[in-house]
Curated annotation (Swiss-Prot):
Matching HAMAP family: AlbA
Localization per record: Cytoplasm; Chromosome
Gene Ontology BP term (one): chromosome condensation
Modifications made to the protein after synthesis: Acetylated. Acetylation at Lys-11 decreases DNA-binding affinity.
Family: Belongs to the histone-like Alba family.
UniProt-recorded name of the protein: DNA/RNA-binding protein Alba
GO MF terms held by the record: double-stranded DNA binding; RNA binding
NCBIfam families, per the entry: DNA-binding protein Alba (TIGR00285), PRK04015.1 (NF003088)
Organism whose genome encodes this protein: Pyrobaculum neutrophilum (strain DSM 2338 / JCM 9278 / NBRC 100436 / V24Sta)
Gene Ontology CC, one term: chromosome
Amino acid sequence: MATEQTILVGKKPATNYVIATVMAFNAGVKRVVLKARGAAISKAVSTAVMVRDRFLPGKVQIKDIKVLSDKVQGQGGRERTVAAVEIVLEMA
């Protein structure tokens, strides 16, 4: 069984990522990393808070938060800098 799982947060509703996170913890994963870029950052934060406070209260804690910036190719081949975040959730 894997001890860590990464979930990439994107365009789907936040509840999809909440369900994926809860299912990972129920399957025995000890650590889940939520990764998001740009506009999806707020969705990743909402996912982490919903899992911690509503779905698994007292069982999951936010272990670490990393704020990053990624270089991506924009339109016309120009390089852009996009904000990114990694939120680490662990079983308490």
